[in-house]
Regions:
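Mid-domain catalytic core of redox enzymes
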Residues: 138-248, 252
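C-terminal catalytic lobe of FAD-dependent flavoproteins
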Residues: 232-288
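Hydrophobic residues at beta-strand termini and immediately following loops
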Residues: 19, 220, 260
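Short loop/edge segments at beta-strand edges and connector loops
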Residues: 3-5, 134-139, 261
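Aromatic-acidic/polar surface patches that form glycan- and anion
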Residues: 112-119, 192, 267-274
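Active-site/ligand-binding neighborhood in enzyme catalytic cores
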Residues: 15, 20-149, 160
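A short alpha-helix-loop-beta-strand transition element characteristic
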Residues: 1-13, 68-70
Length: 288
């Protein structure tokens, strides 16, 4: 592991400011001189919009107030989901923390990092085992009879032939550009919340591994409803449909069929959460 610490910036009004929101974010955007936690907490309290939390807009307003919501979250969310935050469940913006310190790390875990040779090699090493056979371009239902247990990681609605209706997913498109410059942007990931930019963020991959080059290969990331399914869309309608599939999936556990992962559990997972979910399922099955 390379012990990389993830830091994200957002390009707002010509300035790069930290995400999650922290003291520096507020000072830069509003020309303030907040210097400690107490002052930051006071600023947040003055700006937060209190009320019932029914959706992601309510969630963001309760955390950061109207101005920061409009500057950093509203249009970014619209670009990412093609929905207004008021149409999304609270969980979308609820999971983004707000800091009352100068801490600019995206995550707060004690240990953080990426596999030294990347996730492709990481997965290759996992699969390189005498008891594992990989079959590509093969329909899962052709292999069910070969297994004592089936762990399904595809779309749960597809498994059940969409009998309760199709679930919605979002995909991504990437536009890669090469620049004759060593340091194109100040962080590995820079968000672009303004509708002035069609992409949601730009990524400089070499910063994940602290490598150097006289060139910068930048990925512009675009959210899309077309393409490989990456993100479940967290609306009440989708949640209600998923609950029906979830009940059906639970019944199949007695037949040793299990649903795991983003698409099968219709849930947003970070990488560490996805791995933990798989390990917990293993313990549930084999440590009874």
């Amino acid at each position: 592991w390379n012990m990389y610490e993830h830091k994200v910036l957002s390009y707002v009004n010509g300035k790069h400011v930290p995400v999650p929101v922290n003291i520096t974010t507020v000072n830069e955007l509003f020309d303030l001189k907040i210097s400690n936690t107490s002052e930051m907490q006071s600023w947040l309290k003055e700006n937060q919009v209190k009320g019932e939390i029914n959706n992601s807009k309510d969630s963001a307003l309760a955390k950061v107030g109207q101005e920061l919501y409009e500057l950093m979250f509203e249009n970014y969310t619209i670009k990412q989901w093609d929905l207004n935050p008021s149409e999304l469940e609270p969980s979308v913006l609820e999971r983004i923390p707000v800091r009352d310190t100068f801490n600019d790390r995206y995550f707060s875990d004690k240990y953080e990092g990426l596999p030294s040779n990347g996730y492709t090699e990481f997965v290759k090493n996992i699969l390189d085992h005498k008891n594992i056979t990989v079959e590509l371009n093969t329909e899962y239902n052709n292999s069910i009879h070969k297994s004592n247990k089936l762990f399904f990681t595809g779309k749960i609605d597809s498994y059940f032939a969409d009998k309760f209706g199709k679930l919605e997913y979002r995909s991504l498109n990437f536009n890669y550009k090469t620049y004759d410059i060593e340091d194109y942007q100040p962080a590995a990931v820079v968000n672009y919340p303004s509708l002035e930019y069609p992409y949601t963020r730009k990524i400089d991959y070499k910063k994940f591994y602290n490598t150097t080059s006289k060139y910068s290969i930048i990925a512009e990331e675009f959210s899309s409803s077309i393409g490989e399914e990456y993100y479940p869309v967290p609306t009440k309608k989708n949640r209600d449909i998923y609950s029906k599939y979830q009940a059906e999936a639970k019944k199949l556990e007695s037949n040793n069929i299990y649903f795991v992962g983003r698409l099968a559990e219709y849930k947003y997972f970070n990488m560490d959460q996805a791995i933990l979910s798989a390990l917990e399922l293993f313990d549930k099955i084999y440590k009874k």
